[in-house]
Amino acid sequence: MAMKNTSHVLLLSLLLCLMFVIGLVEASIPDDDMGPAIYTPPSGSCGAPISKYDFQVLAKRPPPCRRPRLENTEDVTHTTRP
C-alpha cells in the first residue's frame, strides 16, 4: 500500500479543504430560488398575521399587543434573597 505512510491528519485536512472549495463554488452559482418571501407587517400591527384577506379583519379589531396587562395582586415587595 502506497498510502501507508500518509497520515490521517493530512488526508482529513485535504478532505476538509476540498469540501470548503466545493462549498464556495456552489455558493457562487446564481440561483433563482431565493427561498420563501418574508413580508414585514405594517407598523403598529404588533406581529399580527397578514395575508391578502386579513386586512379587513385587522382593521376591525385591535392588534394583540394593545390588550391591557393583568395586574399582579401578589405582594412582591419582600425578597427571599439575603
Curated annotation (Swiss-Prot):
Keywords: Apoplast, Cell membrane, Cleavage on pair of basic residues, Endoplasmic reticulum, Golgi apparatus, Membrane, Plant defense, Secreted, Signal. One of its GO terms (molecular function) is LRR domain binding. A motif (SxS motif essential for MIK2 binding) lies at residues 43-45. A motif (SCOOP motif) lies at residues 43-55. Mostly expressed in stems and siliques, and, to a lower extent, in roots, leaves, seeds and flowers. Mainly observed in young and mature trichomes, hydathodes, the shoot apical meristem (SAM), leaf primordia, hypocotyls, stomatal guard cells and emerging lateral roots. Residues 68-82 have a biased composition (Basic and acidic residues). GO terms for cellular component: apoplast; endoplasmic reticulum; Golgi apparatus; plasma membrane. Induction: Induced by pathogenic bacteria Pseudomonas syringae pv. tomato (Pst) DC3000, jasmonate (MeJA), ethylene (ET) and salicylic acid (SA), mainly in shoots. Induced by increased levels of photorespiratory hydrogen peroxide H(2)O(2). Up-regulated by heat stress. Strongly induced by the necrotrophic fungus Botrytis cinerea, both in locally and systemically infected leaves. Residues 28-42 form a propeptide. Residues 61-82 are annotated as: Disordered. One of its GO terms (biological process) is response to bacterium. Residues 1-27 form the signal peptide. It is found in: Cell membrane; Secreted, Extracellular space, Apoplast; Endoplasmic reticulum; Golgi apparatus. Interacts with MIK2 (via extracellular leucine-rich repeat domain); this interaction triggers the formation of complex between MIK2 and the BAK1/SERK3 and SERK4 coreceptors, and subsequent BAK1 activation by phosphorylation. Brassicaceae-specific phytocytokine (plant endogenous peptide released into the apoplast) perceived by MIK2 in a BAK1/SERK3 and SERK4 coreceptors-dependent manner, that modulates various physiological and antimicrobial processes including growth prevention and reactive oxygen species (ROS) response regulation. Inhibits the fungal growth of Alternaria brassicicola, Sclerotinia sclerotiorum, Fusarium graminearum, yeast (Saccharomyces) and Botrytis cinerea, thus being an antimicrobial peptide (AMP). Prevents global growth and development. Belongs to the serine rich endogenous peptide (SCOOP) phytocytokine family. This is Secreted transmembrane peptide 9.
